[in-house]
Amino acid sequence: MNKAFNTKLAVLSLALTLGSGVVQAADTIKVGVLHSLSGTMAISETTLKDTVLMLVDEQNKKGGLLGKKLEAVVVDPASNWPLFAEKARELIEKEKVDVVFGGWTSVSRKSMLPVFEELNSILFYPVQYEGEESSKNVFYTGAAPNQQAIPAVDYLMDELGIERWVLAGTDYVYPRTTNKILEAYLKSKGVSDKDIMINYTPFGHSDWQSIVSDVKKFGSEGKKTAVVSTINGDANVPFYKELGAQGISSEDIPVVAFSVGEEELSGMDTSALVGHLAAWNYFMSVDTQANEEFVEAWHKFIKDDKRVTNDPMEASYIGFNMWVQAVTNAGTTDPEAVQDALIGVAVPNLSGGYSTMLPNHHITKPVLIGEIQDDGQFDIVWETKGLVAGDAWSDFLPESAKLFSSWSKPFSCGAFNVETKKCSGGN
């Protein structure tokens, strides 16, 4: 009798223990962090991992979300593009995360995207990209081309009188598509083929001598020349060093970069870079109270007052706060409900004002041009008068000029053809 009773008691105790574990597991809301912590993109992405950890920590200090603590789950896709898809699946299926913040390169995003669509999860992508995409499961808080590349070219043309153009990029989808858009845009402005030079290099490229020599020659033929750079990752370090080595100053041939910010400059000798430009939607030097508080919080969290902030960090900050607001409004972390609740959410950005999530899953943001200073910071030399709405499909490519995106129900289409009146999907 006692033996049978003890057996039942043991079974009951085990059941309670297992049940308790289930309750505890469901007691947190899991946030996936999918940024490269090793490989060629670690120079840029490691900081974004730390940014999300800071935001999770701050939210937990406010009481968490829906009465639960947030739990960050960090993985390292190691700058290996197929591994991004594997790690995304691991986060969603095995770790049961409710949202993922991750990616930098477009090839990493393209690798992950089918996984998020298959499993109907949510990805916040915080980096400027080439556009030509709108997915139900991705929220793009970085700049589309009309929020960075096009305004930068306008600035060079209108303010600096640039007539010849070097479009230099890393050899993958973001630079190639962005430069395709820019080439079409430049030609629409009357720039001829002979005044456009296009060059691509692999990730991690280190020998820039002959390429920079070609750029120097191209810029010495009588017309004011600029380089529009979509070079990504650690290849930027030897690129700028070679510019300095060949005596190319910002007055001779200015470079405007779309993937060089404070983080990349923090590890470089900036003496040869002074006066060159970058186009972003945020700089650490922005003079607002919100930015001052963000920088202070960052230094406190990272325990290093020398660490910088940059544009993708702000995009992560905006995306995280949008997600928190949408989950709060929806009263659940259910992906379908949160996707619907995100449209129309407006949160403060760090440049002043509010950024809004649009039906095409892009946001409104200001556009800033900054000039590199000798301390690795940027002096803001130009900015848009208001916020610019992100455009998923470029007006300057014939195949996409007729496409329109809205995920608002009942429309729910990422690529609606206004001529055929048919939806052709999202990307």
Please place each PLM-identified region on the residue numbering.
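Gram-negative bacterial Sec-dependent N-terminal signal peptides
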Residues: 1-24
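Beta-alpha junction/loop-to-helix N-cap segments that form part of ligand/metal-binding clefts
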Residues: 43-50, 63-132, 141, 200-209
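Periplasmic-binding protein-like
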Residues: 91-103, 124-126, 164-169, 222-233, ...
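Extracellular/periplasmic Venus flytrap/periplasmic-binding protein
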Residues: 86, 130-131, 137-246, 285-293, ...
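Extracytoplasmic "Venus flytrap"
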Residues: 32-51, 75-82, 104-107, 171-176, ...
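Solvent-exposed, acidic/polar segments of extracytosolic/periplasmic ligand-binding ectodomains
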Residues: 29, 346-427
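Extracellular/periplasmic periplasmic-binding protein-like sensory domains
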Residues: 242-317, 327-333, 384-415, 419-420
